[in-house]
Amino acid sequence: MPWWLISLTFIYRLFLCATIRTVEAPDEWWQSTEVAYNMVFGKGHLPWEWRYGLRSVFFPAVVALPFYLLKLLGRDTTWAVWFAPRVLQALVLTLIDVSVFRMGATLDELLAKRELELAEEMRQSKTKGFSYFREVFVSRSRRGICNSISYTALLLSLSNWYMAYCGVRLYGNVIEALLVLLTLQQRRYVPFLLLTGLASAIRVTSAVVLSPLVFRHLANATREHGFTRGLFRIVLTGLIVLVAVLGGVMVLDYCFYGRWVLTPLAFFRFNVLHNLSRFFGEHPWYFYVGPVLVGIVGPHVLFTIAAPLVLWRDTASRAVSRPVLGMLGIGAWTLGFYSLIDHKEMRFVFVVIPLSLITAAFVLVRWSRTSAVVVKMNRLFVLFNIVMIYLMGYVYRRGPLDVMAEVRDGPRINRLDVIATCYTVPGYSYMHRKVNHLGFVDCSIDLDEKTGLPKVTEDIMFRRYPKEYVLWRYDGKHSFNMGDLEESRKASELQSVVMPKSAPHPDAMVMTRAVAKEIEEPFLKRHGYRLYRTFLHSPLTLAPYEDIYIQMWVKVTK
């Protein structure tokens, strides 16, 4: 991939990372930039997973590097602390694009070699027949269209809506996808193991995703050194790399947690073996293989699933059957494995996108030679993705980041409370030095020692009784009718979870318009708050407990 194209790709990815204003899930802040901010600046809230040692500090430590550099140089301004992770994420996305291009280029080389062989066979043939005229027609129809898998795959990667929408966010899933792509390109066993170890340090499930590739390296080793020696080399090298990577991760986690903890095992036990992640939402087994695959790959998935047909009918294409079927196999294995876990999110299978797009590019190049309809379909699909990037990246659910932009550009606030559902907005990493104290509805999970199930949280109480929660938290009173048995039960439930007057009245409050209407008379106006600004969150709301508008209220000082 030429350097000028890499530079343009990075500029495009940086533009997306810096301008996209919508939100997807709280983990894009609270498992990355907020943890990194806490590591460097010693301030902020850590989600409950970090209390139980479920996550390795490896990924947040990578994010913390630009924070530490800014702090060391004394350049940690509000804007710089916000912008630095965007540069890092743009670099990760660009490397994914480069990997997509390189893997596509490998297919190009194999196809070009095979086509040269076929052309030579035809020239040497005395009776050319129908195949000769077909080859002439194909060569002519290739004029004026892109017949490069690498460039087509890059185009699909740059235009894919979910790659732009999710890839700009600092999820561990995105850098995991990069490491998986790099791993797939390794022919030597040691680099393969090292990259697999790094991917597993970020998300332990990567080890399961990449496990089928071990058999490929085992086959190569036994072919080169014999079965016994080859197996011995594979096992011994694997153990050495495993101890090195796992030991390094444990030392890094010890520095953060202050105790020895095997985070991959804790994560795997909690989310996979005990399946406790199901309390954050459950989906049917076909969720990934049905709506998610179609959703994240987009309409180009039609070309992806057509790859076996192309390999079967096109003689020249069989030269790339192993890598193409390998990518399809890894994608299917990934979807199948994650389908066994009840808690499912689209970003968990982010790595499937580049693999699917490379395969789709292969089909596009082969079919576009003889079909103008395929070329038009591709253009239409790319246009669809561009529209989706705009809607999902700049329109749908943009309220929280608009609030953060307002805080970054506004005067310093002593105390800002976000009265909304769990982790609706980012923390200090998005408003460095602009807010002295950030308060929010606590949703830290505490497991019951007897049942092993999560206890009721403040967030649950807020969802059930938003007005009463605010009155009880700040004023130590509620409006439940204690003479009514059901109302009395609700009051007791609230009092058992939320401490009365547990927070002072903040200088500013952020909440949905629906909550503001409910507490405007009994709380906001009573304590001298006025509406500062209303932010459009989304033209329509599909998620529960959301609203079309988010409002900021400020306390008027007399």
Curated annotation (Swiss-Prot):
Its EC number is 2.4.1.-. It is a multi-pass membrane protein. The chain crosses the membrane at residues 53-73, 81-101, 164-184, 190-210, 234-254, 292-312, 323-343, 348-368, 372-392. GO terms for cellular component: endoplasmic reticulum membrane. It comes from the Eukaryota. Belongs to the glycosyltransferase 22 family. PIGB subfamily. This is GPI mannosyltransferase 3.
